[in-house]
């Protein structure tokens, strides 16, 4: 008889709007406008993908990058999110996220296989951040 406890690794789950779909138990939505949402956002304008970030406590927005590839735009937004944890106050924010999200599945709208800030949150929450 195996008495070892099976441990499942938390994962990112794509949130759905289909009839009958339910949020899995113990999963946390991490998109905007939650405290875990990525302030870096992407928008397509014609053939160009733009990455923006809102400046806290102002009505200003900065364009971070403009690229022709959606995957690259998403990666730029994820990289910006990751870099936030290297700024003043970033370690405290990472500690808060780790306490709140440890061991939980994370829900976001990003498609599987695409860069997503929830992957950064999973690393932070489960001790895998480099």
Model-derived features: where do they sit?
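Catalytic phosphate/metal-binding cores of nucleic-acid and nucleotide-processing enzymes, i.e., regions
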Residues: 2-129
């Amino acid at each position: 008889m195996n008495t070892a406890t099976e441990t499942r690794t938390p994962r990112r789950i794509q949130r759905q709007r289909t009839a009958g779909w339910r949020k899995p138990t113990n999963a946390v939505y991490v998109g905007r406008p939650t405290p875990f949402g990525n302030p870096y956002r992407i928008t397509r304008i014609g053939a160009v993908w733009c990455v923006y970030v809102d400046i806290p406590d102002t009505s200003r927005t900065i364009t971070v990058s403009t690229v022709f590839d959606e995957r690259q735009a998403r990666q730029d937004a994820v990289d910006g999110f990751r870099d936030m944890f290297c700024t003043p106050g970033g370690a405290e924010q990472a500690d808060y996220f780790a306490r709140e999200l440890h061991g939980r599945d994370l829900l976001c709208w990003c498609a599987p296989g695409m860069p997503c800030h929830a992957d950064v949150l999973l690393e932070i929450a489960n001790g895998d951040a480099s």
